[in-house]
């Protein structure tokens, strides 16, 4: 993230006490699944700091629970990189790959499925362990929304019609930023489930949307130089400049104000949760699960994203340019 762009996040920084162990071993899983096959790929992946991201997203997780979070973060960004080239401008190829990956939500994959799909299948299998059928169905819906968002992005690029409305762009990016599947894993990592009636409440819905919007704003600021280097036009900064005729500086300031306003609303919504719990007559155990989700899921995905974006090497312009030379990325997504 550009060092002169700051955001006030009113939550303390947290990171799993098991972070160092997880970081030391974080390349083992993608290597074992064939997702990283060269030293250059390993070095590039390490620069992203995905173990750090997982340790901040799931600050109470340790051992195998944290490892699952680390593997999910590794998978997320390997998958996302597959769409930085021609595939990301071809809706048919994008749908072909996202369908191949999403098939893991329905059952075992054929051996011919691309490596990135087998990687997702492994993460999904472990994610579902110990979770109820209702939770698995809810999380699967979130994943399908995430995959469909990539097709929408590809259509925009293919038609060479970049978004000219921040509102329309937000609606699309709320899917592809991947916050909801990320927060779902917080329930799995703490071995708890938010009662569905609370999850469906207007208060929690609004809190999750704020968490999502904050993440995508932080991400667009952090990736600004990277996306500019590769000619990407669908970034909130560029969209605000086109939509309003603003300068880059004013667009960034508007995004900073947007985060501040949203987080003020978030704190007000948090204060409403005890009333929500009372309204739905939650048991002591259900209240504990909901509070774990708030602290170790929703709050941590906001603060953790901010801390990670400020330190990750993923968003340097040279990282983006180097991606075009990583031939292994095409192999990961090959559906031939």
Swiss-Prot record:
Residue span of motif DDXXD motif: 80-84
Binding site for Mg(2+) 1: 80, 84
Subunit (UniProt): Monomer.
Binding site for Mg(2+) 2: 80, 84
Pathway: Antibiotic biosynthesis; neopentalenolactone biosynthesis
UniProt keyword annotations, A-Z: Antibiotic biosynthesis, Lyase, Magnesium, Metal-binding
GO MF annotation, one: pentalenene synthase activity
Reaction(s) catalysed (UniProt annotation): (2E,6E)-farnesyl diphosphate = pentalenene + diphosphate
Family the UniProt entry places it in: Belongs to the terpene synthase family.
Name of the protein in its database record: Pentalenene synthase
Domain notes: The Asp-Asp-Xaa-Xaa-Asp/Glu (DDXXD/E) motif is important for the catalytic activity, presumably through binding to Mg(2+).
Record carries keyword Metal-binding: yes
């Amino acid at each position: 993230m550009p060092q002169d762009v700051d955001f006030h996040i009113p939550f303390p920084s947290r990171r799993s006490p098991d972070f160092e162990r997880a970081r030391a071993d974080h390349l083992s899983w993608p290597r074992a699944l064939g997702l990283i096959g060269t030293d250059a790929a390993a070095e590039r992946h390490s620069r992203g700091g995905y173990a750090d991201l997982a340790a901040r997203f799931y600050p109470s997780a340790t051992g195998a629970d944290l490892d699952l979070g680390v593997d999910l973060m590794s998978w997320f960004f390997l998958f996302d990189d597959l769409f930085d080239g021609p595939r990301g401008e071809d809706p048919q190829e994008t749908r072909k790959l996202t369908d191949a990956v999403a098939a893991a939500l329905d059952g075992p994959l054929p051996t011919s499925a691309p490596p990135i799909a087998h990687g997702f299948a492994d993460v999904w299998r472990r994610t579902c362990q110990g979770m109820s059928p209702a939770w698995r169905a809810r999380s699967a819906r979130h994943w399908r929304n995430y995959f469909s968002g990539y097709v929408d992005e590809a259509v925009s690029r293919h038609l060479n019609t970049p978004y000219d409305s921040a509102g329309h762009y937000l609606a699309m990016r709320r899917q592809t930023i991947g916050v909801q599947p990320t927060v779902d894993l917080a329930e799995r990592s703490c071995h708890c489930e938010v009662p569905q009636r609370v999850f469906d409440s207007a208060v929690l819905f609004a809190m999750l949307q704020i968490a999502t919007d904050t993440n995508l704003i932080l991400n667009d600021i952090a990736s600004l130089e990277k996306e500019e280097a590769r000619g990407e036009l669908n970034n909130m900064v560029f969209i605000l400049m086109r939509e309003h005729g603003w300068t880059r500086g004013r667009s960034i300031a508007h995004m900073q104000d947007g985060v501040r306003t949203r987080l003020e609303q978030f704190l007000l919504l948090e204060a409403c949760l005890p009333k929500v719990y009372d309204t739905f007559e939650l048991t002591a155990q259900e209240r504990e699960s909901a509070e774990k989700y708030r602290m170790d899921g929703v709050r941590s995905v906001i603060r953790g994203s901010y801390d990670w974006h400020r330190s990750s090497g993923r968003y340097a312009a040279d990282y983006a340019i180097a991606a075009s030379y990583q031939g292994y990325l095409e192999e990961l997504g090959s559906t031939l």
